[in-house]
Regions:
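Conserved phosphate-coupling serine/threonine residues in phosphotransfer and NTP-handling enzymes
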Residues: 120
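Glycine-centered short loops/turns at secondary-structure junctions
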Residues: 113-114, 192
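Structured helix-beta-strand junction loops
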Residues: 46, 112-113, 139
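Conserved serine/cysteine hydrolase catalytic core
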Residues: 117
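Asp-based, Mg2+/Mn2+-dependent phosphohydrolase catalytic module
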Residues: 1-5, 17-18, 80, 108, ...
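N-terminal helical cap/lid subdomain that shapes the substrate entry/recognition surface
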Residues: 2-101
Length: 225
């Protein structure tokens, strides 16, 4: 029996890639860089590398947020204030929210039958802004953001801190749902939760990180609970 559902936000409920693309293009142009396909592609590689290092505990959040732009602009041979670029990017990202197909309706239906909790590794100010503009707060009992918790997914410390804040929490009645194997699914497994991987692109499952369920879109979750 499922009672507690932990949901990731980016690319689980909201289309982060679309919001990111728009915010990134605006920030780059403001600081003199044309957001060509090659520039955007290189940014995504650098960004992914930085977030993976955060998950492994090798970088702090500030080092990720500014470091990705510092590396990108250095590769482009341009001097810039990485902190200023970061502020511009996050300001634009915070006002962008685009729901994935069926996600809003699914969250609304689930909230009537289960206790929903948001579990995000995103930047607190950005995520709170997006949650507000998307009108998602009423559906969640609590919102857990790593920057405020003090630990990042997939660490057990992140999930343990979440569990401690939930009255009457029962681990065996909980499930973690998200699009990231290395963050959402690995974190859920480490913390003794059932896990559901949102995998719209049909990526291969890694043998060392095996979710209990795999779905292509969030509405499919309802049939598994």
């Amino acid at each position: 029996m499922t009672e507690f559902i932990f949901l990731d936000l980016d690319d689980t409920i909201l289309d982060f890639h679309r919001a990111e693309r728009i915010a990134l293009a605006k920030a780059l142009r403001e600081f003199g860089v044309e957001p060509t396909d090659s520039v955007l592609s290189r940014y995504h590689v650098i960004n992914q590398q930085h977030w993976q290092r955060l998950e492994r505990g090798e970088l702090t959040r500030d080092q990720v947020q500014e470091g990705r732009f510092r590396v990108l602009f250095a590769e482009l041979g341009k001097d810039t204030n990485a902190a200023a670029v970061t502020r511009c990017y996050e300001r634009n990202l915070g006002i962008g929210h685009y729901f994935l197909p069926g996600a809003r309706e699914t969250v609304e239906r689930l909230s009537g039958h289960y206790r929903l909790f948001l579990a995000s590794n995103g930047t607190a100010s950005v995520q709170h802004s997006r949650l507000t503009s998307a009108g998602l707060y009423p559906y969640f009992e609590k919102v857990f953001i790593s920057e405020e918790i003090g630990f990042n997914k997939p660490s057990r410390e992140f999930f343990d801190a979440c569990f401690a804040r939930i009255p009457g929490f029962e681990r065996e009645k909980a499930i973690m749902v998200g699009d990231s194997l290395t963050s959402d699914i690995l974190g859920g497994i480490r913390s003794g939760l059932r896990t559901c991987w949102l995998n719209p692109n049909h990526l291969p499952v890694r043998p060392e990180i095996t979710p209990d369920f795999v779905i292509e879109s969030l509405p499919q979750l309802e049939g598994l609970l």
